[in-house]
């Protein structure tokens, strides 16, 4: 088992977790522990190279520092990625070994569920560390799959953005495009379908699209085209870097408010959206519901109802951000 520590960028610690016996290849990045232990999910993805995985985990962990701070949590920013290889037949052993690596941080990194992960995987990780969340909850306790809370926060953020930009107090009759209908996108469609929204969806996984078509009144769009539909709100809930100098000129929306991390490919892309008059809800604010749930589960200081109340505050928080941005422009 190799535990290699390197220093890069402004991060406090980057650890390459390699284990020849199981085949585990993972990276854990701690961006900051200024506000508390670094907390952030673990992503399972088929990266083309270790360099690609490193680039991803560095951006994601830095974003977690902002997300946790904006949510008012006593957490710093961290993230982990597990590189999924072609031969992943011993996945359970890999997840358990990853738990050993997490435990070696002695609580300075707390892991959670992210893209590609499930509650069952988190339970396997928890066999070797207590510094893990997203475990099955009991009764009214906080915990479990964090994605419904993430989606609830996105809904509250969309409502705030619609009030600010469109002057509408209800979402009924609006058209919203949801890119990505995995855990977060699925629950967002569930919430939106209850308030009379016309929902367009797309995902690289056809089975996910079939699921939301079966359960909700949605319209499927080709994945390559979903960003460029004429809609009131675009809600990216897949992977990041989709807002860039190529895509932004083609957008036909007034609002972008979604759950994907690192939606802007570069800082300049925020300026490009501003120049086009598109209101952008910062991803590290609007998608903070999941980490709020993680904090309540880890510290045991809030039940499920209290978590919902805290997550609902994302709407007013974004409204204040929109007002301040308007004042400073």
Spans of model-derived segments:
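N-terminal ligand-binding/catalytic initiation module
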Residues: 1-140
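Conserved active-site and cofactor/substrate-binding residues in soluble primary-metabolism enzymes
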Residues: 48-56, 89-93, 97, 116-120, ...
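Buried hydrophobic packing segments
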Residues: 57-60, 154-162, 291-295
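Flexible, glycine/charged-enriched surface loops at secondary-structure junctions
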Residues: 68-73, 108-113, 166-175, 223, ...
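Glycine-rich phosphate/diphosphate-binding loop of Rossmann-like nucleotide-binding domains
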Residues: 141, 145-233
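Adenosine-phosphate binding glycine-rich loop
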Residues: 162, 254-329
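Rossmann-like adenosine-cofactor binding region
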Residues: 173, 206-281, 285
């Amino acid at each position: 088992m190799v535990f290699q520590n390197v220093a890069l960028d402004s991060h406090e610690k980057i650890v390459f977790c390699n284990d020849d016996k199981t085949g585990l290849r993972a990276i854990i990045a701690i961006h900051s522990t200024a506000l508390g232990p670094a907390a952030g999910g673990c992503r399972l993805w088929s990266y083309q190279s270790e360099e690609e995985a490193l680039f991803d985990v560095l951006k994601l962990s830095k974003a977690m520092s902002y997300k946790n701070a904006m949510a008012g949590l006593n957490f710093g920013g961290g993230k982990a990625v597990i590189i999924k290889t072609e031969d992943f037949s011993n996945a359970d052993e890999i997840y358990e070994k990853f738990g050993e690596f997490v435990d070696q941080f002695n609580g300075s990194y707390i892991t959670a569920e992210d893209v590609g992960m499930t509650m069952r995987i988190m339970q396997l990780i928890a066999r070797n560390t207590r510094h893990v969340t997203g475990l099955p909850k009991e009764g009214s306790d906080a915990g479990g799959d964090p994605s419904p809370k993430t989606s609830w926060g996105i809904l509250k953020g969309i409502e705030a953005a619609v009030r600010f930009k469109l002057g509408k107090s209800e979402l009924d009759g609006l058209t919203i495009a949801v890119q990505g209908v995995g855990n977060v996108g699925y629950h967002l469609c569930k919430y939106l379908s209850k308030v009379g929204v016309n929902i367009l969806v797309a995902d690289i996984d056809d089975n996910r699209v079939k699921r939301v078509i079966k359960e909700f009144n949605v319209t499927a769009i080709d994945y390559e085209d979903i960003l460029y539909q004429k809609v009131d709100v675009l809600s990216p809930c897949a992977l990041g870097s989709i807002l860039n100098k190529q895509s932004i000129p083609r957008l036909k929306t007034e609002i972008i408010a979604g759950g994907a991390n690192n939606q802007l490919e570069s800082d300049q892309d925020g300026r490009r959206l501003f120049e086009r008059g598109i209101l952008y809800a910062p991803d590290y604010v609007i998608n903070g519901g999941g980490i709020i749930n993680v904090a309540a589960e880890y510290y045991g200081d809030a039940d499920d109802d209290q978590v919902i109340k805290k997550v609902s505050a994302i709407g007013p928080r974004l409204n204040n951000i929109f007002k301040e941005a308007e004042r400073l422009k």
